[in-house]
Amino acid sequence: TDIGILAEKIRWLGTVRYTISSLFYIFNIKKRYGTLFINNKKFKENYLFVLIANTKYTGKGMLIAPDANLNDGLLDLIIVKNNINKFALIKLLPKLFTGEHISSQYVEYKQVKSIEIIPEKNECLNIDGEIYGTTPVKVNISNKKLPIYFY
């Protein structure tokens, strides 16, 4: 979310704004702590950020969740741990485009039915590139259900 908020403020720079925002974020890392309920099991976590996906790709071609499948009834959960140093984080960024980031010791990748995030301090939510609402947040997946609205 931090990257997205800054990127919106410098939108006039075009697509390079995400690279600039990412670098700014790396040098101003905000470590987070909170409680996660993963499939209704409670975990205390230290993390930089938590990302929930239902498709393989996000942004401009980032293979963020290589095992994601729209039809499997699962959410893909990516947790970047806050014990990562700045150098390791810089090395990790290019791997987001190949999916190799999920094998990093600093990344936890799981497929789950539900996730609830209750951070120590509430944060803005970035939902599909839009800042919308704040934490805490609970996300569930409903298998093979898609609401259709007619106007």
What is each residue range found by the language model?
Residues T1-Y151:
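Long C-terminal subdomains/extensions of small-metabolite kinases
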